[in-house]
């Protein structure tokens, strides 16, 4: 397990605010939901605000796990992934919070730090509940952003950045083997999955076997739910939690978008998707969304009810794939 989860205080973050803005920090509030980094709203003495990201062991709730395919699907954390993904997405014209400060010195706080623009319009998830009519054009703009990202392609899968590695075998084989590992882990914990483990393993192998390797891959966010989209003062969508971005079969993204946006997915849909890839990635995705939350709950993450709900929902989705 990573560190002891000692969150930072206003006093701890004064030097960060001073370095970023040249002003005194009035208060620092840790925002909820982060599992791999600390997210803090920094309120300055003039009333303006910024957002601080802190990466260190104490802010990371995830138990360490071996992953032989780190180039493509591994848990995404760290300032270098953030910087590379932020740059890559911004170059497509898609809005991400502006960067105010990057500090890797560990002099300001015990960890790597980024300070970014505070987009105060709230999340798209909340907007769809609070004002569905206002959310509709934001969703359409988000669809355009998704398509702009997908249009940025390259010949090898993996994370962005000059030093990023790529898998040495077809992406669908990487996804299959990862899903089989997730299935094995989940079957040890969930009797309903254990009872049909062989059928699920067979379905993964069969769905993967019909896929032909691809020569180009599109840019995806990786975890693009409405909670990872903020809305700015002009009702433009702003993508956050971008560290998982990379080049991959775009069907992986759309399997996730279908799940997270539900009846509003049509705003984000694109033509020409490979239906066989979608079918394969849906099953792999549901297994990952059981394994991940259950593994996170091996530690001290405080949002336990929410993670259990995600796992339970995706257990049902996984079993439904056998119908």
What are these regions (language model features)?
Residues 47, 111, 215-217, 235:
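Conserved catalytic motifs of the protein kinase core domain
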Residues 185-189, 195, 289-323:
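ATP/Mg2+ or Mg2+-diphosphate-binding catalytic cores
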Residues 2-45, 152:
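Charged, low-complexity intrinsically disordered tails and linkers
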Residues 8-24, 104-107, 130-140, 147-220, ...:
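An alpha-helical support segment within catalytic cores of ATP-dependent transferases
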Residues 32-36, 40-166:
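ATP-binding pocket architecture of kinase catalytic cores
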Residues 61-64, 217-220, 225-280:
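Active-site Asp-x-Gly
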């Amino acid at each position: 397990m990573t560190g002891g989860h000692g969150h930072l205080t206003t006093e701890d973050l004064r030097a960060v605010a001073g370095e970023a803005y040249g002003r005194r920090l009035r208060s620092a509030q840790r925002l909820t939901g982060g599992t791999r980094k600390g997210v803090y709203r920094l309120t300055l003495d003039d009333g303006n605000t910024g957002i601080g990201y802190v990466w260190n062991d104490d802010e990371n709730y995830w138990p360490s796990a071996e992953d032989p395919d780190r180039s493509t699907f591994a848990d995404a954390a760290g300032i270098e992934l953030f910087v590379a993904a932020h740059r890559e997405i911004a170059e497509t014209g898609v809005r991400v919070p502006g960067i105010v400060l990057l500090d890797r010195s560990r002099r300001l706080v015990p960890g790597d730090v980024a300070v970014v623009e505070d987009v105060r319009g709230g999340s798209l998830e909340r907007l769809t509940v609070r004002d569905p009519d206002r959310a509709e054009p934001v969703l359409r703009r988000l669809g355009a952003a998704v398509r702009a990202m997908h249009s940025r392609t390259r010949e090898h899968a993996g994370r962005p950045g000059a030093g990023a590695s790529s898998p040495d075998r077809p992406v669908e084989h990487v996804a299959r083997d990862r899903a089989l590992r997730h299935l094995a882990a989940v079957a040890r914990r969930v009797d309903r999955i254990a009872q049909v483990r062989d059928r699920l393993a067979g379905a993964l192998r069969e769905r993967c076997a019909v896929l032909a390797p691809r020569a180009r891959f599109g840019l995806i966010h990786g975890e693009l739910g409405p909670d990872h989209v903020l809305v700015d003062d002009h009702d433009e969508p702003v993508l956050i939690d971008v560290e998982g971005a990379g080049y991959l079969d775009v069907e992986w993204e759309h399997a996730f978008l279908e799940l997270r946006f539900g009846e509003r997915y049509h705003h984000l849909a694109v033509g020409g998707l490979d239906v066989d890839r979608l079918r394969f990635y849906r099953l792999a995705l549901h297994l990952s969304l059981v394994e991940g939350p259950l593994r996170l709950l091996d530690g001290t993450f405080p949002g336990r009810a929410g993670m259990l709900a995600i796992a339970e929902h995706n257990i049902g989705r996984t079993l439904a794939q056998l119908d």
